[in-house]
Regions:
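Regulatory loop-to-helix N-cap segments in sensory/regulatory domains
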Residues: 1-4, 129-136
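Intrinsically disordered, low-complexity terminal regulatory regions
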Residues: 1-62
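General structural signal for alpha-helix termini and helix-helix connectors
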Residues: 20-24, 101, 131
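Regulatory sensory and allosteric helical modules in signal-transduction proteins
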Residues: 46, 54-104
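A short, aliphatic-rich beta-strand micro-motif
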Residues: 110-117
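Short glycine-/small-residue motifs
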Residues: 124-125
Length: 136
């Protein structure tokens, strides 16, 4: 497991790499695809890194890296639906202890979900699952 300093340093490097990818391309689909690949390859123990896009009713699976996953998530359901509905970042140290958890991959032990909001409107969420508890 990482120390807090190692985690901070890795996140800073990851942010610089992501910024470089975004500067080189303006297509949202290509950017989401490359972003999920970067996250999957950079963050240790990652079992899923991807995006769920909001279609006005529910979250639909978008570009991701990992195993086959849930394709649709209702608002308020699971960590992704909860994060999307509340428009807040959620960090779950142990998914087995989270009451509202939806298991899309049995290898996931911890999870972080970050809502994507533009001008007050939900676009979707970034979902990253880790194969160990307290991964984030």
């Amino acid at each position: 497991m990482w120390t807090e300093k190692q985690k901070k340093d890795a996140y800073e490097i990851l942010l610089l790499q992501q910024q470089g990818l975004l500067e080189a391309e303006d297509n949202w689909l290509a950017n989401l695809a490359n972003s999920s690949a970067l996250l999957n390859e950079t963050l240790p123990e990652t079992v899923f890194a991807g995006y769920y896009l909001f279609d006005g009713n529910e979250l639909i699976l978008g570009p991701f890296q990992g195993r086959v996953s849930c394709t649709r998530i209702k608002m308020g359901k699971g960590v992704c639906g909860e994060s999307a509905e509340k428009q807040v970042t959620l960090i779950v140290d142990d998914v087995k202890k989270h009451e509202n958890y939806i298991s899309c991959d049995s290898a996931a032990q911890s999870e972080i979900v970050v809502p994507m909001v533009k001008e007050g409107h939900l676009i979707g969420v970034l979902d990253i699952d880790c194969g160990v508890t307290k991964g984030y």
